[in-house]
């Protein structure tokens, strides 16, 4: 896989550089919504319980597209409708988001039970965690080809 984005970063640290790209309040939630909740459209993202405002959602979708984490696709039979899918770089973030889910489930008070994501038994079981990550990734990829049969890639500006 090639490097996704070249620019000047505040340091040479990969953690800092990654946060420069996806460390805002909304980007990982959009990625989560795509692979975990199978949201694809602007309207679906805007209906998330976190209540992202439409101007910020537009900005984050465009940013994630520009850094090649997601791609914007146009429906062939409806030129006004767009769906968003993860790129290879975006798919590589699935384990990271799942690790954050597990961390939040175990470390944030009053957070458990908000979403039944099947993660409560994964914290100390590396095999179960890897199996879960593989299952979520495969589930996302399995649903993807069905959707892409009616999509056309829109070139990024």
Residue ranges of model-derived segments:
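Canonical helix-turn-helix DNA-binding module
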Residues: 49-73, 79
């Amino acid at each position: 896989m090639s490097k996704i984005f070249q620019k000047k970063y505040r340091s040479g640290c990969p953690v800092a550089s990654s946060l420069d790209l996806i460390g805002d309040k909304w980007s990982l939630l959009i990625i989560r919504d795509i692979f975990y909740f199978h949201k694809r459209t602007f309207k679906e993202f805007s209906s998330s319980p976190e209540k992202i405002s439409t101007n910020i959602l537009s900005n984050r979708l465009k940013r994630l597209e520009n850094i090649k984490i997601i791609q914007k696709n146009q429906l062939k039979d409806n030129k006004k409708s767009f769906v968003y899918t993860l790129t290879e770089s975006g798919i590589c973030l699935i384990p990271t988001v799942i690790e954050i889910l597990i961390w939040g489930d175990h470390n944030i008070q009053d957070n458990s039970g908000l979403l039944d994501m099947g993660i409560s038994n994964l914290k100390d079981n590396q095999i179960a965690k890897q199996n879960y990550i593989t299952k979520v990734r495969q589930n996302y990829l399995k649903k993807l080809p069905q959707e892409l049969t009616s999509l056309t890639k829109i070139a990024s500006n």
